């Protein structure tokens, strides 16, 4: 994805909280102009806009391009089971998201930088592809050098109160080692989103 360089607050003001995209928060307020308020209540949000918003939430949260998301949707539809759940699982099992969910980086963009710079090993080999698909039994380690360990340890210290490894992941903080225990389950995906609306958004294009 071409990295989004615009104001992050503007994005979450439109789409809502996206913790993997930014830790920034917004203060919500209501305008006192009653006429404008009445007009806003009378406006009906189209089904297209609702689906578009859900799609954008997913795209920004996982920091992927429109083309990448479309490809994930096409693959998800071909698999057995719920297409929406297949889509979320595929994105959740990306290496950049796994590194983020372990609390090794504050956002997915940050975890992607760690991966690109060779700080992350999978099954004993350096993996510098953020979209690498993790699977059960994969062992994830931090590169055994002082620079890598300092970066990760600093992130863990800052993020420890915000992150707990989900049930499909195991993380040993002392050894800086993690393991993928099983595929992520829908209930372990923290992003508040209606994935079926995203499948509907792309249904005519697939």
From Swiss-Prot:
Its main location: plastid. Pfam families: Ribosomal_S4, S4. GO terms for cellular component: plastid; small ribosomal subunit. It is found in: Plastid. The keyword Ribosomal protein applies. Gene3D superfamilies: Ribosomal Protein S4 Delta 41, Chain A, domain 1 (1.10.1050.10), RNA-binding S4 domain (3.10.290.10). One of its GO terms (molecular function) is rRNA binding. Keywords: Plastid, Ribonucleoprotein, Ribosomal protein, RNA-binding, rRNA-binding. Residues 93-161 form the S4 RNA-binding domain. InterPro entries: Ribosomal_uS4, Ribosomal_uS4_bac-type, Ribosomal_uS4_CS, Ribosomal_uS4_N, S4_RNA-bd, S4_RNA-bd_sf. GO terms for biological process: ribosomal small subunit biogenesis; translation. SMART domains: Ribosomal_S4 (SM01390), S4 (SM00363). Belongs to the universal ribosomal protein uS4 family. One of the primary rRNA binding proteins, it binds directly to 16S rRNA where it nucleates assembly of the body of the 30S subunit. With S5 and S12 plays an important role in translational accuracy. Part of the 30S ribosomal subunit. Contacts protein S5. The interaction surface between S4 and S5 is involved in control of translational fidelity. This is Small ribosomal subunit protein uS4c. It comes from Euglena longa (Euglenophycean alga).
């Amino acid at each position: 994805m071409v990295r989004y360089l615009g104001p992050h607050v503007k994005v979450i003001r439109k789409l809502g909280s996206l913790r993997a995209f930014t830790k920034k928060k917004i203060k919500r307020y209501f305008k006192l102009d009653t006429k404008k308020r009445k007009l806003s209540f009378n406006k009906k949000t189209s089904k297209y806009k609702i689906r578009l918003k859900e799609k954008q939430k997913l795209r920004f949260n996982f920091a992927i391009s429109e083309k990448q998301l479309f490809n994930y949707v096409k693959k998800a539809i071909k698999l057995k089971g719920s297409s929406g759940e297949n889509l979320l699982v595929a994105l959740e099992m990306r290496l950049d998201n796994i590194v983020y969910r372990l609390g090794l980086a504050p956002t997915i963009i940050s975890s992607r930088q760690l991966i690109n710079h060779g700080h992350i090993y999978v099954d004993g080999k350096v993996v510098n592809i953020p979209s690498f698909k993790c699977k059960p039994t994969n062992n994830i380690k931090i590169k055994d050098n002082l620079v890598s360990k300092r970066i990760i340890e600093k992130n863990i210290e800052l993020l420890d109160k915000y992150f707990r490894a989900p049930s499909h992941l195991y993380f040993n903080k002392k050894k800086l080692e993690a393991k993928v225990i099983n595929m992520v389950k829908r209930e372990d995906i923290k992003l508040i989103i209606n994935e079926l609306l995203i499948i509907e958004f792309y249904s005519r294009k697939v």
